[in-house]
């Protein structure tokens, strides 16, 4: 459960008394989705990690777990060492689970870097105390580059953006698979 700051507590208490308190509860209460037979599933905000040697691309889901959005690219050592900027993202976005891209071959088997990525992702998840899932990231960087080229960016301008776009692409695929 995310920690509540004094400011957040004040806002929550003030808004609970307001005429639109019901709307406020809908906005701050995690969404529930009824699956056949009345079974409800609680959605969680998810952070995707596209882990590279130099950079880690980050993407985040909406609270309902339906839409992914590119967020940021951080130096790999900041994320791997659970640096201040990464911790702030996890706390501010109230992240409840992580999804890491896993490099797969075209045959659907784990690629040569998969073991290293798996180890790094597990280290990050352990430091955050969050559950970790893996997702096939096959061709996500290539698709991210294609999207950025269509937007008119050259290779140099793409450099920092490809990783977060790729993270958003495989996070969206993972979110869709959870529905």
Predicted segments, located by residue:
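Phosphate- and other anionic-substrate recognition elements at nucleic-acid/protein interfaces
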Residues: 39-47, 53-179
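Hydrophobic alpha-helical context, especially transmembrane and signal-peptide helices
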Residues: 13, 27-28, 48, 92
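Short, Lys/Arg-enriched N-terminal segments with co-localized hydrophobic residues
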Residues: 19, 33-43
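Generic early N-terminus positional signal peaking at residue ~5-7
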Residues: 6, 48-49
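Cationic, amphipathic, low-complexity segments that mediate targeting or membrane/lipid association
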Residues: 3-23, 29
